[in-house]
């Protein structure tokens, strides 16, 4: 009788564990593309820890197999997607969010190699049943999310006559409706809109060299614009036909323009580092943009700023900075975490520094207030893959290794 009861308890424990994993897979959060659903770095998660334990939040799982590179994560329907270099090929890889186990891995292009680190830089974009990914050497692919089956692939540099940039193509593709948009950097085809179903060309525009930034849409009246940050300028194009509506070269540093522009209403903040700065432009009813201000107090390098309330929060060089969006007035600056990248969730910034330190920082223009920190246990440095908060977990990547931390408030 005692043995039967033990067997029943073991069976129940296995059943509960299985149900918990299945439930998590169904509610494991939604982060479908670079910087989240709206490309703004803001997670809709609530019920998260307001203060971390001394050694940081508990580790839910850790897995290897992400490969080399700095690709961040896209998360949907219980799957986490990223890209990585394995051997001489770049792969799009799917992991189970509940366990960290690999579901599939699909090769989609050749290896990008560089003295600042090999492998892909961009993040996959989930749209419906498919994933769109752009590798470090310009390989663009459409892959079925459930199975990993390759729908189509092309090299945008070869297709449109562009040449790779110094530290590799770093863009995360933008999907709007039927259009798949990328900064291909070719003559007469700097920006291309492709049919997401088969990769066929819808329109092409401009001749700028590619930048490292990822695009973002902005709605002005009845017109949807797409804002790109190329090698030489920020610019707004009409989504319908690629017509140039405005340009803003002052924000560009002509070295590495990497930050994604920040949008609120008809205003767009565009920023770069290498001693340059950032500017706010306002788009009028005619679709043209005028500068509101330019400042050297917010110089985004790899990491984009996040707009929360009336203030931008971002790394200006290596200094975490809070600045009023409409005026450029600085609220505070702090060096405590060090240079890195950020994501926002439930009242706090999750800051990942290049040296592997992770900080929880309360969002307030009143001043810097840290609520906990820890260091990822193994780091290859620099940790450039941007953090993600989804489904009550903080996801971090250090090259081949992915960490999932439970940040839910118990």
Regions found by a protein language model. Give the residues of each.
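Noncatalytic, solvent-exposed loop/strand surfaces
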Residues: 24-410
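Bacterial N-terminal signal peptides
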Residues: 9-22
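N-terminal secretory signal peptides that target proteins for export/translocation
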Residues: 1-6
């Amino acid at each position: 009788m005692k043995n039967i009861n033990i067997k029943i308890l073991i069976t129940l424990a296995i059943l509960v564990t299985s149900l918990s994993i299945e439930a998590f897979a169904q509610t494991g959060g939604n982060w479908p593309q670079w910087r989240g659903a709206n490309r703004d770095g803001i997670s809709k998660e609530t019920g998260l820890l307001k203060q971390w334990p001394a050694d940081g939040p508990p580790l839910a799982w850790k897995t290897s197999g992400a490969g080399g590179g700095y690709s961040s994560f896209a998360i949907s329907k219980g799957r986490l997607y990223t890209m990585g270099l394995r051997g001489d090929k770049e792969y799009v890889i799917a992991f189970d969010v509940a366990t960290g186990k690999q579901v599939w891995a699909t090769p989609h292009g050749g290896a990008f190699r560089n003295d600042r680190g090999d492998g892909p830089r961009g993040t996959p974009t989930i749209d419906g049943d498919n994933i769109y990914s752009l590798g470090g050497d310009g390989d663009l692919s459409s892959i079925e999310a459930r199975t990993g089956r390759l729908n189509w692939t092309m090299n945008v540099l070869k297709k449109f006559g562009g040449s790779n940039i110094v530290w590799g193509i770093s863009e995360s593709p933008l999907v709007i409706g039927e259009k798949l948009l990328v900064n291909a950097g070719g003559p007469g085809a700097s920006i291309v809109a492709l049919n997401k179903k088969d990769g066929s060309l819808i329109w092409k525009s401009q001749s700028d060299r590619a930048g490292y930034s990822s695009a973002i849409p902005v709605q002005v009246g009845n017109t949807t614009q797409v804002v790109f940050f190329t090698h030489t300028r920020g610019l707004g194009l009409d989504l319908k036909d690629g017509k140039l509506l405005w340009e803003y070269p002052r924000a560009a540093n002509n070295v590495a323009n990497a930050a994604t522009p920040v949008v609120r209403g008809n205003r767009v903040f565009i920023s770069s580092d290498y001693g340059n700065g950032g500017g706010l432009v306002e788009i009028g009813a005619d679709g043209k943009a005028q500068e509101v201000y330019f400042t050297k107090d917010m110089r985004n390098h790899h990491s984009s700023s996040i707009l929360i309330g009336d203030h931008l929060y971002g790394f200006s060089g290596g200094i975490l900075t809070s600045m009023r969006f409409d005026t450029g007035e600085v609220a505070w600056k702090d060096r405590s975490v060090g240079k890195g990248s950020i994501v926002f969730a439930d009242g706090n910034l999750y800051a990942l520094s290049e040296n592997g330190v992770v900080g929880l920082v309360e969002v307030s223009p009143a001043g810097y207030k840290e609520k906990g920190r820890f260091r990822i246990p193994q780091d290859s440095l620099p940790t450039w893959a941007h953090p993600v908060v989804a489904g009550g977990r903080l996801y971090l990547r250090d090259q081949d290794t992915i960490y999932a931390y439970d940040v839910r408030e118990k």
